[in-house]
C-alpha cells in the first residue's frame, strides 16, 4: 500500500474482518492525512466485495483465504487485471549441508515469527538431513531466545478461532522447543516440532 501511494496511485483498501480494530485505525489515519476520495477504506461484506471487484482496477493485491482468492482471480480475469494473490500454503526451506546453520536458523526463525507467523509467505517447514537436525534446532532455539527473551506471551494470534486451530495442530507431535500457550491472551509460544509424519494435518 505504501509503495502504491508513494508512486502516485489511488488505492482502495479492504481491511480483513479478522482485524477490525486495525482496520478502523487505518481508516481514521488515512482520512486524517489523505484524501478519502482517492484512498477510501471499504468495509463491505463478501457479497459487497464481489460487487466492488466488478470495477476495473489497474492492479489487485489480495491476502486471504484461497476460497475467496478464486473469486478475486475470476473477477480480475474479466479485465485481464494483474494480480498478486497471497493465500498461504506450505513454504518449505531446504538446508544444504554446506550452509551456515546459525545464519540459516536465524533467518528462518525471523521469517517464520514475523507478525507472529501470520504471513502467507512465512517459512513453513525445514527439510534437512538427520545429521543437521540437532544443530539446526540448537541455533533455532538460540534465535528464538534472542527474539523473544523466552516470553511466551509475545506472539498473540489474531482470533480465538485461529488460536484453537493452531494449538490443535500441535496434538500428538514431538515438541523440540516452545509449546506453551495462553488461551486468555490468545498467545502461542514460537514452537519447533520434529519428525512430523507427512500425513499430519500440520503439513497439509
Would you name each region that the model predicts?
Residues 1-103:
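Rossmann-like NAD(P) dinucleotide-binding subdomain of oxidoreductase/dehydrogenase enzymes
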Residues 1, 199-204:
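Short, intrinsically disordered, charge-balanced linker/junction segments flanking boundaries
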Residues 34, 67-201:
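ALDH superfamily catalytic-core signature
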Amino acid at each position: 500500500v505504501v509503495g502504491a501511494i508513494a508512486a502516485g496511485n489511488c488505492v482502495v483498501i479492504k481491511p480483513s474482518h479478522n482485524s477490525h480494530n486495525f482496520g478502523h485505525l487505518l481508516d481514521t489515519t488515512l482520512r486524517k492525512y489523505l484524501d478519502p476520495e482517492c484512498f477510501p477504506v471499504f468495509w463491505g461484506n463478501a457479497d459487497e466485495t464481489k460487487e466492488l471487484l466488478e470495477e476495473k482496477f489497474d492492479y489487485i493485491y489480495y491476502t486471504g483465504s484461497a476460497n475467496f482468492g478464486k473469486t478475486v482471480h475470476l473477477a480480475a480475469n474479466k479485465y485481464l487485471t494483474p494480480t498478486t494473490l497471497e493465500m498461504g500454503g506450505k513454504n518449505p526451506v531446504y538446508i544444504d549441508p554446506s550452509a551456515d546453520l546459525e545464519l540459516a536458523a536465524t533467518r528462518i526463525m525471523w521469517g517464520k515469527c514475523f507478525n507472529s507467523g501470520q504471513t502467507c509467505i512465512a517459512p513453513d517447514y525445514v527439510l534437512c538431513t538427520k545429521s543437521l537436525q540437532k544443530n539446526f534446532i540448537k541455533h533455532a532455539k538460540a534465535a528464538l531466545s534472542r527474539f523473544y527473551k523466552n516470553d511466551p506471551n509475545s506472539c498473540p494470534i489474531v482470533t480465538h478461532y485461529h488460536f484453537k486451530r493452531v494449538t490443535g495442530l500441535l496434538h500428538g507431535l514431538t515438541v523440540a522447543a516452545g509449546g506453551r500457550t495462553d488461551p486468555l491472551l490468545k498467545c502461542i509460544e514460537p514452537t519447533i516440532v520434529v519428525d512430523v509424519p507427512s500425513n499430519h494435518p500440520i503439513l497439509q
